[in-house]
């Protein structure tokens, strides 16, 4: 991987982190909470500028970033501090970073599908020797329903065919404005169940947005399943990568064009959002959990106890990040 690719990958990763932190920043500002510092990167200071009450900084280590909100980590006498806001405002501010990651993911995917084309249920090609061709289905036909259920998302069609495991499926098709019904049985090929059909790609902003939401939803489901398997010991920790691994993957995708890089950025942004919502100390999800715990217990858990918990969580998180960096260097560089 070239030096240029590494630098570009680091910049792109920093932009994703900046997007996350901007979510916290924007929510805090909108809800009247004082923001003392907005930083991209961590560690030694490279650049700093004061604008109004907020200090904007760029730091040397591209391993994260932060938005320093008044009173977030302890008591503050400032009337505009985080701690003096109602519980719902705290939750909004804490969740805004992940929300921004989700928005960024959808925006990036929308751009990709608008440019490259979004999936449709109209067929572009019918392959020789597969069930669809044998049943007389033609390119240009549109899938309207399967087994009486309407379908307008190609990936749902793919999932339904794969889940059928070769059982008969009733396809309602449209050709030249007329409907017809045919029964197909999927054929297994290389471990998958296939009908031998390929969808047509359409360059439509509406379809692009719909495909972006569909892809985001299915990816979130897959990530959620992975997190459950990881914490229950059913998935390997070898599949988890750190900053070095992420930068390496972005650099590798750069070889295949900008579309691949943007797609990977969208998935990484989604991953950042979901990881930050995990209910673990020091993460946004852990802080949100404490907001509800303190609401239910009527603040029987004080700022000091919460602060110590998050501090321990941060130490463990930094240790995990250091371990992942060490392992990624050995895996991707050495």
Give the predicted meaning of each segment.
Residues 4-8, 12, 88-93, 259-263:
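Alpha-helical transmembrane segments of integral membrane proteins
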Residues 4-77, 278-297:
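Small-residue-rich helix-interface/hinge motifs
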Residues 8, 19, 30, 37, ...:
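Internal alpha-helical transmembrane segments
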Residues 13-17, 68, 101, 268-276, ...:
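Alpha-helical transmembrane segments of multi-pass membrane proteins
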Residues 81, 85, 179, 185-274, ...:
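Functional transmembrane alpha-helices
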Residues 107, 111-115, 273, 277, ...:
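Hydrophobic membrane-targeting alpha-helices
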Residues 132-154, 309:
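Conserved PDZ fold ligand-binding element
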């Amino acid at each position: 991987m070239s030096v240029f690719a590494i630098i570009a990958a680091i910049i792109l990763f920093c932009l994703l982190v900046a997007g996350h932190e901007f979510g916290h920043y924007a929510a805090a500002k909108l809800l009247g909470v004082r923001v003392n510092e907005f930083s991209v990167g961590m560690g030694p200071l490279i650049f700093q500028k004061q604008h109004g009450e907020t200090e904007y900084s760029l730091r040397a280590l591209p391993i994260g970033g932060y938005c320093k909100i008044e009173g977030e980590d302890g008591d503050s006498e400032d009337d505009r501090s985080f701690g003096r806001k109602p519980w719902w405002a705290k939750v909004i501010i804490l969740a805004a970073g992940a929300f921004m990651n989700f928005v960024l993911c959808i925006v990036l995917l929308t751009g990709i599908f608008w440019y490259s084309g979004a999936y449709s249920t109209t067929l572009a090609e019918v392959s020789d020797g597969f069930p669809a061709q044998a049943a007389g289905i033609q390119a240009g036909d549109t899938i309207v329903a399967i087994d009486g259920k309407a379908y307008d998302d190609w990936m749902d069609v793919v999932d339904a065919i794969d889940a059928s495991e070769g059982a008969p499926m009733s396809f309602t098709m449209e050709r030249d404005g007329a409907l017809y019904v045919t029964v197909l049985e999927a054929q297994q090929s290389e471990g998958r169940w296939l009908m031998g059909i390929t969808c047509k790609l359409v360059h439509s902003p509406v379809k692009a947005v719909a495909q972006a939401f569909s892809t985001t939803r299915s990816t979130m489901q897959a990530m959620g399943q992975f997190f459950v398997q990881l914490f229950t010991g059913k998935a390997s920790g070898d599949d988890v990568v750190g900053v070095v691994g992420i930068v390496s993957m972005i650099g590798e995708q750069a070889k295949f064009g900008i579309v691949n890089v943007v797609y990977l950025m969208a998935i990484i942004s989604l991953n950042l959002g979901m990881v930050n919502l995990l209910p673990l100390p020091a993460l946004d999800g852990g802080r949100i959990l404490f907001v509800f715990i303190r609401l239910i217990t009527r603040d029987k858990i004080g700022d000091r106890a919460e602060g110590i918990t998050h501090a321990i969580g941060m130490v463990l998180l930094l240790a995990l990040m250091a371990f992942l960096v060490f392992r990624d260097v050995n895996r991707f560089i050495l």
